[in-house]
């Protein structure tokens, strides 16, 4: 089957875009990921960097990746139950190892677990409309839970939002020194992530996967609509997302990132805007693909998308080496950390282009496929129940 190069490019953009936000999770304490005032004060440089990234990227690229993951579930249906379940179970195992031994910001475990539930919903959906509507409903349930958490939360700040000096020093200690102590702390992080997944985030993740599957089943993610449709839809959706998110960014700044409002209630506009912007970004890429595809860089980014899993793990290896093993953790502010993003992007791009000159799949993708074959046997042509 001929590859959808546009889809590969969108996936590549998602993988590269995720690093714009993850770089602060690698280079700064965990609290800094959502709270630019994590150390109790904030410089204008940090505030403006946070605001810009929040507007264009925070949650948006993860949402785009979840959308494409759901599209992948739709594409995998012909391979059958054993193949899909084996593939996703292996992803869960990989995510657990990644989160326990390498980095506490893993997303693979969550995607694998939610995927194990969602693929059946995708398979059993009687129509594109029902699949899409179910996805929207699940996403809204997740937002409702987030609202409830905000309403019942204490106004007093949490140590996870604004950690004290001893907490920051301890996090720096175990991240730089590694060993059993680091594994124990990452294990706690995996446990907390699973609790958040079951209570709130999993609803949103499942919703986006189903929406992505619906867009693939309808032909939208196959590029079967007109260029005018994609362009118009893209501009409208991105504009809607910005209009929803921008006031919340300004209000968080105005409130000095106060815990109750900014850790919960003012996260909602961002979470609500993310699907609009993510789908809008994808729509613009499809709409302007005839122009974009002329550039070698665009085709190189499509290679990154073909090796998405390999490149996600490569980002972890590079960034943990830089910030933990070479002791660059907490040495740079939010804006300065962005200087590390472009070299990592270049590593992703060059490695992908060179590798795919000689091989059909990325190394981790190849291993994933081989292990799936061993676990499930050859894929079958009909989706078994």
Task: Give residue ranges: language-model regions.
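N-terminal signal-anchor module of multipass membrane proteins
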Residues: 1-69, 76
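Membrane-interface interhelical connector segments
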Residues: 32-35, 251-265
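Juxtamembrane membrane-water interface segments that cap and precede transmembrane helices
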Residues: 41-53, 178-193, 257-267
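Specific transmembrane alpha-helix
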Residues: 63-78, 109-122, 200-223, 273-293
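Solvent-exposed interhelical
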Residues: 80-82, 119-134, 214-236
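Long hydrophobic alpha-helical segments that form multi-pass transmembrane helix bundles
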Residues: 133-215
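Alpha-helical transmembrane segments of multi-pass integral membrane proteins
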Residues: 205, 259-358
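Membrane-proximal cytoplasmic C-terminal regulatory module of class A 7TM GPCRs
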Residues: 360-385
């Amino acid at each position: 089957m001929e590859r959808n190069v546009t889809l590969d490019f969108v996936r590549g953009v998602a993988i590269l875009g995720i690093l714009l936000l993850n770089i602060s999770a690698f280079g700064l304490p965990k609290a800094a990921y959502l709270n630019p005032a994590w150390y109790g004060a904030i410089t204008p440089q940090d505030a403006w960097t946070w605001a810009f990234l929040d507007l264009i990227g925070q949650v948006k690229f993860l949402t785009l990746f979840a959308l494409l993951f759901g599209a992948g579930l739709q594409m995998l249906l012909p391979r059958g139950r054993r193949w899909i379940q084996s593939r996703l179970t292996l992803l869960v195992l990989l995510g657990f190892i990644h989160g326990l031994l390498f980095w506490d910001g893993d997303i693979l475990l969550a995607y694998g677990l939610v995927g194990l539930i969602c693929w059946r919903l995708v398979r059993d959906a009687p129509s594109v409309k029902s699949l899409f509507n179910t996805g929207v409903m699940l996403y809204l349930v997740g937002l409702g839970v987030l609202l409830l958490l905000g309403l019942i939360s204490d106004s007093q700040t949490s140590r996870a939002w604004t950690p004290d000096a001893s907490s920051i020093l301890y996090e720096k200690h175990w991240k730089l020194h590694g060993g059993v102590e680091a594994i124990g702390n990452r294990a706690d992080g995996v446990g907390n992530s699973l609790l958040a997944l079951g209570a709130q985030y999993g609803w949103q993740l499942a919703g986006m996967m189903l929406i992505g599957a619906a867009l693939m089943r309808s032909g939208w993610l196959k590029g079967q609509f007109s260029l005018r449709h994609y362009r118009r839809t893209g501009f409208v959706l991105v504009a809607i997302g910005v209009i929803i998110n921008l006031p919340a960014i300004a209000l968080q700044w105005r409130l000095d990132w106060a815990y109750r409002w900014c850790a919960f209630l003012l996260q909602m506009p961002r979470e609500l805007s993310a699907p609009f912007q993510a789908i809008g970004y994808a729509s613009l890429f499809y709409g302007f693909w005839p122009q974009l595809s002329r550039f070698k860089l665009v085709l190189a980014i499509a290679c990154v998308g073909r090796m998405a899993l390999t490149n996600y793990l490569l980002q972890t290896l590079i960034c943990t080496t830089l910030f933990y093993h070479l002791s660059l953790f907490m040495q740079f502010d939010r804006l300065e950390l962005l200087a590390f993003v472009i070299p990592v992007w270049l590593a992703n791009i060059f490695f992908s282009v060179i590798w795919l000159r000689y091989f059909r799949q990325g190394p981790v993708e190849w291993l994933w496929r081989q292990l799936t074959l061993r676990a499930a046997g050859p894929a079958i042509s009909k989706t078994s129940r």
